[in-house]
Design a protein with these regions (language model features):
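Hydrophobic/aromatic-rich transmembrane helices and adjacent perimembrane loops
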Residues: 176, 224, 230, 271-275, ...
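Signature aromatic-anchored transmembrane alpha helix within multi-pass, membrane-resident enzymes
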Residues: 252-258, 299-308, 433, 439-469
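Transmembrane-helix motifs of polytopic, lipid-linked glycan transferases
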Residues: 7-12, 59-69, 173-195, 381-384
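Short periplasmic/luminal acceptor-recognition loop of GT-C membrane glycosyltransferases, typified by
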Residues: 462-468, 474-537, 559-567, 589
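Membrane-embedded, hydrophobic transmembrane alpha-helices
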Residues: 1-80, 558, 782, 788
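Transmembrane alpha-helical segments
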Residues: 264-269, 312-315, 413, 438-441, ...
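Periplasmic/ER-lumenal interhelical loops and adjacent helix-loop junctions
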Residues: 117, 123, 130-131, 142-151, ...
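Active-site lumenal/periplasmic loops and adjacent helix-entry segments of GT-C-fold
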Residues: 90-230
């Protein structure tokens, strides 16, 4: 549907311009129109809901107006296959995973914000009135009030209803579509330089996927990908303006693309847009077009851009105020692990994570050394490509490379490392394109030796680019579809039962639970988080789950619904909450207003010990403070048997204790852990394994395989339960945890968030601990029991 809508809008823009667009640019121009229109209509609440029908009707009008062209036009096979191939490459990690999901999970939390914006803006525009305090509301307010660019997001939102899917499951195909349109624009830029269409298509296919573009695509960076595509499109569109016989309105496609760039990334696009517009103006003047036509064209361009960019201009002051520090601070890294190497712009980076220096071996060769060799080859080839373009007066390629480099240098002089990374990514298709032009220049020579050398040069650059893509595919972090889908079902099931609290660190919780006014207590967007932490507890840390025992009782009681990640070591909610749902990964508890709220709460247990025997002095103090006739309630639960991977007999090389989770190991490559655990009493147990798993991890007890985990990336401190239950005897049991070797499956490499945590044996099934209730006067009876907590209740 996105292709059809973009195609129809491209034909409509063509009609408005009164010129015939190059066939390969119809869809990219239509996509630009979709971005600009959706940004405009979603600015106001009154027009937001009309966005989808409006763009569909406009696309239909475009097909009707351009019907004659469509009837006489065939499919231009080479660029079409190049774009389809790029789409397939960028979509491969999701498609070959077998699940509709998205990439960049645990790598870039901003994707959750994009999901929120897409849903909210298409229904209510930028109006947040009526939203109660929650992480959902706080995140939206923070971004919308700051003038955050939303054009590329709402373009997806405009067509999402046509798919009937949650935005999370169509997000990655949209990013792949953006890069496919980049390939079409690159094909157009080299039209006059590379005569053979199949050569041109091969060059566009490779140049559209330099390592940084792939890396940003596989972390969900929607604005940056849109900018890379728009910059190439602007250059491709500026060439036809030089013709003297073009009507004044011929600038409309360029203006629409310019407005799309502003909608996609805001005023930050000006280092690219302004020079391109200046080139168009100078080129028009050089063609001896009358000054009246020059002024008229400039006026039409400025007018179209101004109207379509009203939302951006209206929020300009807020945007400048909020982004000044983020863009220019020398210490702002965003999600980077350090400043990127400028040579990464060459398009080759043999690391599964573009943020890391290549550190593996490839076919027995050192990846870092091989990277530098291939980067050097690409740079040498780029000089050949530039020289050939100059000799052939291929001005579009020279303009594209020159402006991209100048804009990148400008951003890197004033920008933060975070902004520098974006600029390097945006320039990388231009760098890769001119490097790939080098072999094409040489292959046209007369000598056989030079043609053979051209082939070797082209293969080396192609191998570097495709090798970088393959490594990124192997280390991609895919979101756990089934778990997040369960969270979405809970959000729909509990709609209207808010406010809700979730204690897991799950940045996508605020999207999937949006109908229940969710608050993630350890989120970056957590209202009144200062009131959450219990004095003397472990506190609330961003990026980590929080146990209910570490929260103030009054804070927890604010919420009607609790959405809790299932865990063998998590505390039971207060006694006035009852469980209303149990799934594979989550439980839902609802406050029962028919039960009196606890007057006081004595937390017990810590870390992997969810319960302990209370000190009699503490129970006595609780009893003394209780009103006459009160009750003491306490869940009984034993300490669960456990095996700590950090205490294994031997830890494999490449595995080490996680810096932020001292009871877990960061794992890389194949390995096994051996040890023992002791079970105090025979019975049926559920096996839980902490960690975040990409490739399969198996668990064996006494030489028998009992569980397998895989495709379950997760945040810190969380557990996954093995299906079914185990019947085990009392005593010592041998434990073996094995992580196998890699495969060709996406995400099967050693990317981010691969951890192995404690093995816990919990009670079989989903039964909750029995809550013991005794009169205050019988408080001593609780001192000898293993308890989760003790609460005081009015009778």
């Amino acid at each position: 549907m996105l292709l059809l809508v973009s195609g129809g809008l491209g034909l409509l823009v063509e009609q408005a311009a009164g010129v015939r667009l190059a066939g390969v640019l119809v869809v990219p121009v239509g996509l630009a129109a979709l971005v600009a229109i959706a940004q405009l209509t979603t600015y106001w609440g009154a027009t937001a809901r009309l966005t989808t029908p409006l763009v569909v009707l406009a696309a239909l009008a475009g097909f009707a107006a351009g019907w004659r062209r469509l009837r006489g036009a065939g499919v231009d096979v080479p660029p079409t296959l190049a774009a389809v191939a790029v789409f397939a490459v960028l979509g491969a990690p999701v498609v070959l995973s077998g699940h509709a999901t998205f990439a960049g999970y645990t790598v870039l939390g901003d994707t959750a914000i994009q999901f929120l914006a897409i849903d909210r803006l298409l229904e209510h525009g930028r109006d947040l009135a009526g939203l109660p305090p929650s992480s959902y509301q706080a995140a939206l307010r923070s971004y919308i009030d700051s003038g955050y660019p939303m054009g590329s997001q709402v373009a997806l939102g405009a067509v999402r209803p046509l798919s009937g899917q949650d935005v999370a499951w169509v997000y990655q195909p949209y990013l792949a579509f953006l890069v496919a349109n980049l390939a079409l624009a690159l094909y157009a830029i080299t039209t006059r330089l590379i005569a053979r269409r199949w050569q041109r298509a091969a060059v566009a296919f490779l140049a559209a996927q330099p390592a940084l573009v792939v890396g940003y695509a596989l972390q969900g960076s929607i604005k940056e990908l849109a900018t890379a595509w728009v910059v190439a499109l602007l250059v491709a569109l500026v060439g036809p303006l030089f013709a003297a016989r073009q009507p004044v309105r011929a600038v409309v496609p360029l203006a629409v693309a310019g407005a799309a760039g502003i909608a996609a990334i805001g005023p930050a696009v000006l280092p690219w847009l302004a020079p391109i517009a200046l080139v168009g103006l100078v080129g028009t003047i050089r063609e001896r077009i009358s000054w009246r036509d020059v002024v008229s064209r400039a006026g039409v361009f400025a007018g179209v851009v101004a109207v379509l960019s009203i939302p951006t201009f209206a929020a300009l002051r807020s945007y400048a105020k909020v982004t000044q520090h983020v863009i220019t601070s020398g210490s702002e890294l965003g999600n980077l692990l350090g400043p990127l190497n400028p040579l990464q712009a060459a398009g080759i980076w043999l690391s599964g994570d573009y943020r890391l220096v290549p550190a593996t071996t490839i076919a027995g060769l050192d990846a870092r050394a091989l990277t530098w060799v291939l980067v050097g080859v690409a740079l040498a080839s780029a000089t050949i490509g530039l020289a050939w373009a100059l000799s052939r007066r291929a001005w579009l390629l020279l303009v594209y490379v020159g402006i991209s480099l100048l804009a990148c240098v400008y951003v890197m002089r004033i920008g933060s490392p975070w902004a520098d990374g974006k600029a390097l990514m945006i320039v990388s298709p231009a760098a890769a394109l001119v490097a790939l032009v080098g072999p094409v220049a040489l292959v046209g020579t007369r000598t056989l030796e030079t043609r053979v050398g051209a082939g070797v040069l082209g293969l080396a650059i192609a191998a570097g680019i495709l090798g970088s893509t393959a490594l990124a595919y192997h280390d991609v972090s895919l979101a756990p579809r089934d778990r997040l889908a369960e969270l979405g079902r809970i959000g729909a099931r509990e709609a209207g039962q808010g406010p809700a609290l979730y204690t897991e660190f799950e940045e996508f919780g605020k999207h999937f639970l949006r109908a229940v006014d969710p608050t993630g207590v350890s989120e970056a967007f957590s209202p009144d988080v200062a009131a959450a932490a219990r004095p003397g507890g472990n506190g609330v840390r961003f990026g980590y789950p929080v146990d209910l025992d570490d929260l103030n009782l009054g804070y927890v009681e604010r919420f009607r619904t609790l959405v809790l990640r299932r865990s063998p070591v998590a505390s039971r909610p207060p006694v006035n909450f009852r469980r209303v749902y149990v799934g594979r990964w989550y439980e839902v508890w609802r406050r029962d207003d028919a039960v009196s709220r606890p007057l006081a709460h004595l937390p017990l247990g810590r870390g992997l010990l969810p319960a302990e025997r209370p000190r009699c002095a503490d129970v006595a103090a609780l009893a003394r403070q209780a009103p006459r006739g009160a009750q003491l309630a306490a869940p009984e639960r034993p300490a669960p048997p456990r095996f700590l991977p950090t205490k294994a007999r031997r830890i494999p090389g490449g595995w080490h204790v996680d810096g932020g989770e001292p009871l877990a190991l960061d794992v890389s490559g194949q390995g096994e852990l051996l040890g023992t655990l002791t079970i105090p009493s025979a019975g049926r147990y559920t096996l839980w394994l902490g960690g975040s798993f990409a490739r399969p991890v198996t668990v064996a007890l006494d030489g028998r395989r009992v569980a397998r985990f895989g495709d379950e990336l997760s945040g810190r401190g969380e557990f996954a339960a093995a299906p079914g239950s185990l019947t085990l005897r009392a005593g010592r049991h041998a434990v073996r945890i094995f992580r196998g070797g890699g495969s060709l499956a996406p995400g099967n490499g050693n990317g981010a968030s691969r951890r192995l945590g404690p093995l816990i044996l919990g009670p079989a099934g989903s039964a909750q601990p029995r809550v013991v209730s005794v009169p205050v006067g019988a408080w001593r009876s609780l001192c000898s029991r293993s308890l989760d907590w003790v609460e005081t209740l009015r009778r």
